[in-house]
A protein has these predicted regions:
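Conserved, mostly hydrophobic/aromatic
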Residues: 8, 39, 47, 92, ...
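Conserved anion-binding
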Residues: 12-15, 19-23, 98-171
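Glycine-rich, proline-tolerant flexible connector loops at the mouths of alpha/beta enzymes
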Residues: 46-62, 104, 165-175
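Conserved beta-strand positions in the central sheet of alpha/beta enzyme cores
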Residues: 48-51, 78, 101-102, 125, ...
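N-terminal active-site wall of soluble small-molecule enzyme domains
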Residues: 48-93, 179-183
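Charged helix-capping and loop-helix junction motifs
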Residues: 60-67, 110, 141-150, 175-183
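Catalytic cores of alpha/beta
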Residues: 77-96, 180-215
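Glycine-rich phosphate-binding active-site loops on the catalytic face of alpha/beta enzymes
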Residues: 94-112, 197-201, 213-229
Length: 237
């Protein structure tokens, strides 16, 4: 299983939100590139990034930071947050990003998702943000009509390879991850699933590893010191 340490970007800084709430933001670093280099020094091969400003308004104000990390480290960079047009996908991928995550747009704009997969294949991933059993959109502010299963079924049929699945109720709360949900999903679908939200102790990593998931994202637990990144990477192997 691959470990994806995470950087959320806002105003060119590395920040974290509590349960997706923009009013509960903690700034962890003024220099995200330093954080990424630190991940790399600790043995990380992947990095998960979200542009929180982009998630709100569909722009790319942190593109230069993302490009820097893609080009000045050897990390596999995946980025999400407000990617709603082919122009934005092109921008990120030509800046050196390895994989782009479509969130709201994958739920609301089937044609866009289809053409993105046709053009870029495995470089396109989908973010499934789960709230009360349904897929949430628009920076977690709205609930869509899709249940989790209906959405996974559809994505698999459309040729999506990787889904980053977040239980919003667990995100940033440091109360553990939704093991039952990931266990059920990994048994039902042949997608590469990345667990996100609430991975807050090394035991969470061990439990997810047993399910043979493709990946797990570690965010707040890294910044607060609750998880040692090097140990998590070892345990996940």
């Amino acid at each position: 299983m691959n470990i994806f340490p995470a950087i959320d970007l806002y105003d060119k800084k590395a920040v974290r939100l509590f349960k997706g709430d923009y009013n509960q933001m903690t700034v962890y670093s003024e220099n995200p590139i330093d954080v990424a280099r630190d991940f790399e020094a600790k043995g990380a091969k992947f990095i998960h990034m979200v542009d929180l400003e982009g998630a709100k308004d569909g722009t790319t104000p942190n593109l230069s930071i993302v490009a820097d990390i893609a080009n000045k480290t050897s990390l596999f960079v995946e980025i999400g947050g407000g990617i709603r047009s082919m122009e934005t996908v092109d921008k990120y991928l030509s800046a050196g990003v390895s994989r782009v995550i479509l969130g709201t747009s994958a739920v609301t704009d089937e044609e866009f998702l289809k053409s993105a997969i046709e053009k870029y294949g495995e470089k396109i991933a989908v973010g499934a943000d789960v709230k009360d059993g349904y897929i949430a959109i628009k920076g977690w502010l709205e609930k869509s009509a899709y249940t989790l299963d209906a959405f996974f079924e559809k994505m698999q049929n459309m040729g999506v390879k990787t889904i980053i699945c977040t239980d919003i109720s667990k995100d940033g709360a440091m109360k553990g991850t939704n093991l039952q949900m990931y266990s059920e999903l990994s048994k039902k679908y042949s997608l590469d699933i990345v667990a996100s939200g609430g991975v807050s102790a090394i035991d969470d990593v061990k439990a997810l590893r047993k399910m043979e998931l493709y990946g797990a994202i570690i965010g707040k637990a890294y910044y607060t010191g609750a998880i040692d990144l090097t140990e998590a990477i070892e345990v996940a192997k």
